[in-house]
Amino acid sequence: MPSDVRSLLAGTRNIGIMAHIDAGKTTTTERILFYTGVNYKIGEVHEGGATMDWMEQEQERGITITSAATTCLWRDHTINIIDTPGHVDFTVEVERSLRVLDGAVAVFDAVAGVEPQSETVWKQADRYNVPRIAFVNKMDRVGAEFHRCVEMMIDRLDATPAVIQLPWGVEADFRGVIDLVRMKGLLWKTEDKGASYETVDIPRDHLEAAQEWRDKLLETVAENDDELMELYLEGEEPSTEQLVAALRRATLASKVNPVLCGSAFKNKGVQPMLDAVVDFLPNPLDIGATVGHAVGDEETEVRREPSEDEPFSALAFKIMSDPYVGKLTYIRVYSGKLTGGSPVLNSTKDRKERVGRILQMHANHREDREGVGAGQIVAVVGLKNTTTGDTLCDPNAPVILESMTFPAPVIHVAIEPKTKADQQKLGTAIQRLAEEDPTFQVRTDEETGQTIIAGMGELHLDVLVDRMRREFGVEANVGKPQVAYRETIRRKVEKVDYTHKKQTGGSGQYARVIINLEPSGGDGGGYEFENKVTGGRIPREYIPSVDAGCQEAMEFGVLAGYPLVDVKVTLLDGQFHDVDSSELAFKIAGSMAFKDAARKADPVLLEPLMAVEVTTPEDHMGDVIGDLNSRRGQIQAMEERGGSRIVRALVPLSEMFGYVGDLRSKTSGRASYSMQFDSYAEVPANVAKEIIAKARGE
C-alpha cells in the first residue's frame, strides 16, 4: 500500500457519540465541530439551533432522531462523527451506526450516572466489539459526582474504567481537569468560549488525590498490557509516550475504557477528549480485514483488507431523503476505491447500481468528492435498489458483508389519510420512511383494509407521523396504539396427519403430510423446520412447499390471529399422487396440518414486557410503586441516587399507554421515567381471555 494512502488511513477515525437521552451528546458534538473549526457559531440544543439536529422536529423536541454523519479535522486527523440518538425508541439508529464505526465516545451525565439507555447502547457496542472511551459530562451541574459515575460503569456496565482525568472543582466551582497521564492541570478561559486553555502545575491541595489516582491508573493499565506490566514490575515510572501507547493497546483490545470529564455546555474538557479520540481509538488499519462471505455460499469466507489496492466493498448503513438531491445512501467503504459515476453491484440483492455523486457530509451542508477510498464514510446519490444493511461491491469481485440485526416492532397504530388527495401521498411517504428505517413496518389489515404502521414506541411513531406531515404534506388520522401480541405453544404434539384433496373432474389436488409440532425454546421469532421423510414418500421438490405452508400459517395464530413464534416443525411422512400432487397442494396441506397441530399444542398468548425505570422524589415513592403494581408491574429493584429514588420494574406494554400523564399528576410533575423493550411473556389467563374475545370481535 502506498505510504500516503497508509498515512491517510492511519489518520482516520470513524467514531460514534453514544449516550442516554439528555446526557449532552449533541452539545458535545456541537463543541467538537466548533473547536475543530467547522462551525463558527456554537449551536445550543435548548435553543433549537444545534447543527447536528437538523430535522425540524429534532430542534423542537431537543432530541436527536437520525444519526447525521459529519467530518471534521483535529491534529491532522480526519474524524468522521456519527451522532446517534439516545432515546430508546431509536435504538435502530444506534445499532446501525455501531455496525460501521471503529470506535465510540460514551457520554455520561455526571448527575444521573449510568442510565438505562446507556446500558442498552453499551451492550450493543459490546456485541460489535467497538473500543470506546468515556466522557463524564455536566461536571458543572448541582449533584455532579464523577467517582460515583465511574463506580456505576463497573457495577452496571461491567466495564474496566481507566481514569485519566480528575475534575478540578465541582458543580459551580468546576474550573478544569487534572490530567493524570501528563500530571498537569488544565484550566479553561471563558473569554474565547473555551477555545484555549492553559496547562499549569497541579495545585497542592489536589496533588495527593492526583498521585493516588495515577497509581490506580498505572495498575489498571499494567494489568491489561504486558509491556507496561514489565515496567511496572521493575519499579520503573513509564514515560508519557509509553503510558499513552499502553493505554491505546489496551483500549483497542477492549480491555479498558479511558475515562475523561468536563462540561461541554460550559466549554470545558472537549479538546482533551478529541485528543483521546486520536490517541486511543482505532483507525481502519487497526480494525484490520473485514470478513464477509461469498455470494450464495455463507460457508466460504471472503476477506477484504482496508486498502485501496483491494476490490471495492462497502456497507450501506443509512438511507435518507434529501430535499435537494433525492435519496442519499450513507456508506462505509471497507476496501478499494469508488469514483463518481462508476457501476457497483448490490450483492445482497444481486442488482447492478450506478453511483452518481459522492458527497462528504457535514450535518446539513455537503461537499462533492471525486472519489473515496477504504476507511471513509460518505453519502452517495443515485442508488435505486439499495436499502439499509446491503453490501455494495466491485461487480467483478462480489462479496456479502455481515449485515445488521434489527428488533421487531412492539407497537402499531392504524393510519388513514384525511382526504382522498392525501391517499396517494400517504403511500409515497410511508414507502420513503420505511426505506429509511428498518424498524418501521407497514402492512394492510386484510379484514379492515386499514393501513397499519408499526414501530419501536409511541415517540417513534409520533415522529414518523409528524415527518409525513412536514416533509410530504400528508394529513393523516392516527388510531390508538395497539400492542404487538404474539402466540406460542406450550407442549409437543405428534403425528398430526392432514390430507388435502380436491378431485372434481379435470386435474385435481392431492397432498398428505404428517408432522410433529413442538416449542423451540427461542425468545420470540424462532422457527425451525426439519425434514425426516425417507424413501421418497414425498418428492424432494415438494418439501419446501410444506415448509412455506407452515410459515404462512404461523403469521396468523389460532387464538387471536397474532403471529406464532418459537416453534419447531418436523415433517415425518406423507403421500403424493403422480398426477394430482403439486407445490400448491403440499403448501395447503402443510398450512392446514400446522393449524391443526397448533390448536392441539396448548397455545398461549404472549405480550411485550417493558423494562421501566422511574426516578421520583422519596415522598412520592409509595404512589409510584402502587401505580406500577396496579399496571401488573413486577418491581425488580429500588435504589437511591442523588437524593432521588429509582424504581425498576417490568410492566406489560399494554398497561403503559398514557403513563406519562398519570405519572405527572401523581407526582406533581416531579418524577420522570424511561422504558425499553425487555422480553415477551405469557399473558395471564383472565387478561388473555379479554384480548382473544376482542380480536375475534366477540
From Swiss-Prot:
SMART domains: EFG_C, EFG_IV. The keyword Lyase does not apply. It is found in: Cytoplasm. Residues 10-285 form the tr-type G domain. Belongs to the TRAFAC class translation factor GTPase superfamily. Classic translation factor GTPase family. EF-G/EF-2 subfamily. Gene3D superfamilies: 3.30.230.10, 3.30.70.240, Elongation Factor G (Translational Gtpase), domain 3, P-loop containing nucleotide triphosphate hydrolases, Translation factors. Pfam families: EF-G_D2 (PF22042), EFG_C (PF00679), EFG_III (PF14492), EFG_IV (PF03764), GTP_EFTU (PF00009). The gene is fusA. Catalyzes the GTP-dependent ribosomal translocation step during translation elongation. During this step, the ribosome changes from the pre-translocational (PRE) to the post-translocational (POST) state as the newly formed A-site-bound peptidyl-tRNA and P-site-bound deacylated tRNA move to the P and E sites, respectively. Catalyzes the coordinated movement of the two tRNA molecules, the mRNA and conformational changes in the ribosome. GTP binds at residues 19-26, 83-87, 137-140. GO terms for molecular function: GTP binding; GTPase activity; translation elongation factor activity. It comes from Frankia casuarinae (strain DSM 45818 / CECT 9043 / HFP020203 / CcI3). GO terms for cellular component: cytoplasm. This is Elongation factor G. GO terms for biological process: ribosome disassembly. HAMAP family: EF_G_EF_2_B. Keywords: Cytoplasm, Elongation factor, GTP-binding, Nucleotide-binding, Protein biosynthesis.
